[in-house]
Amino acid sequence: MIDKEKIKKAVRDILEAIGEDPDREGLLETPDRVARMYEEIFAGLHTDVKDVIKIFQEDEHQEIILVKDIPLYSMCEHHLLPFIGVAHVAYLPRKGRILGLSKLARIVDILAKRPQLQERLTSEIADTIMEAVNPLGVAVVIEAEHLCMTMRGIKKPGAKTVTSALRGIFRTDEKSRAEVMSLINSKK
């Protein structure tokens, strides 16, 4: 679990290191607030994604299942600044094995609530679904704005990073890949 006391001390030390007074009125409760926030935004470190996966048998369904625009918030592990965006998650069931739609969003949420790289997050989502459901294919696309590019360094607000992970038929079959990418990119 997260050591909130250690976080509080570290935040207090950071405030002092940047020349602030951690005992002034506006900052007095900041270490506690940050510790509670970290417990929430890093909850995925202590949650097994396999615990939320529930598989249903739907023998008649053999077409692409896509959930688009799943909101995600994660923390870039390089600067501990947020990246915020959406995930599009699609898969093609094998032998009618399907996940509940909300489970796709839960998988995204759990894996995003860790210090992350967008590239790794995209792959972890795809690999988790491949392992859990053994579908014919999985496609995951994430579009996100990284505050480490917005607030510091290059300072380019609005720049979006797009990553994709394709598994199974979506990687090997051009026609299937084109179909799923067309669905993901459609504006409707």
From Swiss-Prot:
Pathway: Cofactor biosynthesis; 7,8-dihydroneopterin triphosphate biosynthesis; 7,8-dihydroneopterin triphosphate from GTP: step 1/1
InterPro entries in the record: GTP-CH-I_C/QueF, GTP-CH-I_N, GTP_CycHdrlase_I, GTP_CycHdrlase_I_CS, GTP_CycHdrlase_I_dom
UniProt keyword Cell division present: no
Signal peptide coordinates: none
Transmembrane regions listed in the UniProt entry: none
GO biological process: one-carbon metabolic process; tetrahydrobiopterin biosynthetic process; tetrahydrofolate biosynthetic process
Keyword GTP-binding: yes
Known EC number: 3.5.4.16
Coiled coil: none
Reactions the enzyme catalyzes: GTP + H2O = 7,8-dihydroneopterin 3'-triphosphate + formate + H(+)
Binding site for Zn(2+): 76, 79, 148
Source domain of life: Bacteria
GO molecular function terms listed in the Swiss-Prot or TrEMBL record: GTP binding; GTP cyclohydrolase I activity; zinc ion binding
Enzymatic class: hydrolase
Keywords: GTP-binding, Hydrolase, Metal-binding, Nucleotide-binding, One-carbon metabolism, Zinc
Subunit structure as annotated in this protein's UniProt entry: Homomer.
Sequence similarity: Belongs to the GTP cyclohydrolase I family.
Family matches, as NCBIfam families: folE, PRK09347.1-2, PRK09347.1-3
Protein name as it appears in the record: GTP cyclohydrolase 1
Species of the source: Thermoanaerobacter pseudethanolicus (strain ATCC 33223 / 39E)
Chain's gene name: folE
